[in-house]
UniProtKB/Swiss-Prot annotation:
Subcellular location: Membrane
Glycosylated residues (UniProt): 111
Protein name per the record: Terpene cyclase ptmB
Naturally occurring in which organism (per UniProt): Penicillium ochrochloron
An example Gene Ontology CC term for this record: membrane
Underlying gene: ptmB
Family assignment from sequence similarity: Belongs to the paxB family.
Membrane topology of this protein: Multi-pass membrane protein
Keyword Lyase: yes
Physiological role: Terpene cyclase; part of the gene cluster that mediates the biosynthesis of the indole diterpenes penitrems. The geranylgeranyl diphosphate (GGPP) synthase ptmG catalyzes the first step in penitrem biosynthesis via conversion of farnesyl pyrophosphate and isopentyl pyrophosphate into geranylgeranyl pyrophosphate (GGPP). Condensation of indole-3-glycerol phosphate with GGPP by the prenyl transferase ptmC then forms 3-geranylgeranylindole (3-GGI).
TM helices/strands, residue ranges: 19-39, 48-68, 78-98, 112-132, 137-157, 172-194, 205-225
Amino acid sequence: MDGFDVSQAPPEYRSVEPIANLFVLGMGLGWLINYVGMIYQSFKDETYGMAIMPLCCNIAWEIVYSLIYPSKSLTEQGVFIAGLTINIGVMYAAIKFAPKEWSHAPLVMRNLSLIFFLATLGFLTGHLALAAEIGHSLAYSWGAVVCQLLLSVGGLCQLLCRGCTRGASYTLWLSRFLGSSCTVGFASLRWMYWPESFSWLNSPLVLWSLALFLTVDGSYGICYWYVRQYELSLKEAEGRKSK
């Protein structure tokens, strides 16, 4: 049974499919808010909000599973295509403003467009290779796991390396967390009510990935708060000096 084809789902899953679709819509809403917010924040702060490698991996995954191996669920199709369309804007903003973040590394700064292109091409072929190796139904989920872990770890590392909240906000963090948590929600329903195709979601590696996502994304919120407080303390100190 192809776990990607909802029309072949057992009656148990079909009975909870409307709830699963709500989680899919929640996933889409969270990520669309995140993408639009990143475009806004990028132009506001003249930087990029998502680390380069996670961004390239993410847009490559969306290309593969929006255009090459589209879901047979119309809800998922709509969410993925909408996400890909807006993510192109995220990529444009990143390419436009990334040179300002790499003035300390001229070789990188002068070749960022090429780096974005090659990284996206590399991840695109990687997602396709994974689909050819284990089938696109499984590769869809495992590729998404890789994207999520890169996003979580890359986002936290970027925040700590910059030492400031430039290109970030609570809205971006919470919308990303909402979108990913909804993904966990509908995956859980598939595992519980469609075990013939999704029993593997209870595997140690999936559970480890889930624990890592929750730990790192939860840590991001705490670290963001500390960095923001540090920024505010510096601003207050400068204000007192100017008096």
